[in-house]
Amino acid sequence: MSDETRERDIYLARAMGWRYVPPGPETAEMYGEGVHCLRDPEGRLRATLFSSSVGDLWNHVTPQFHEWESAKAKLLRWLAADEARWTAFYNEIDALYDEFEAFYNEIDALYDEDESARETQFSVVSWSRFLVTLTPAQVAESAEKALRGLTAEKGENT
């Protein structure tokens, strides 16, 4: 995984609420003395014994949004929970949806030519079908662009 990809994953994790937890009584109880942890958005402590620095901890513990379907799903849910985030994300992936819709319209045109195939014809190009076809990397890249755009917009408005 490239440094740019990993940095994007860490940026998204921080935006979603992942936080650094320094060694202390709470971390010692779960993992032992001197262990650095991250707290995920659900409040669970996450650690790895392979981390030699705080930066290394972020590299090893945060979700790999570019690769994991489960991380993609959590990211989509988090984006959808806020109207501004979702709108910014939607604006980023709109061009991808147009390509997806054009592809399915071509398939529909083929089915239209064959009367016997009408029963299995796609009636609607659904938004949910589109989201499922996006790769984790496409979602992560679009989410990062959307969130950075929102951050820049907020900076201009203050």
Regions found by a protein language model. Name each.
Residues 1-158:
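Glycine-rich anion-binding surface patch
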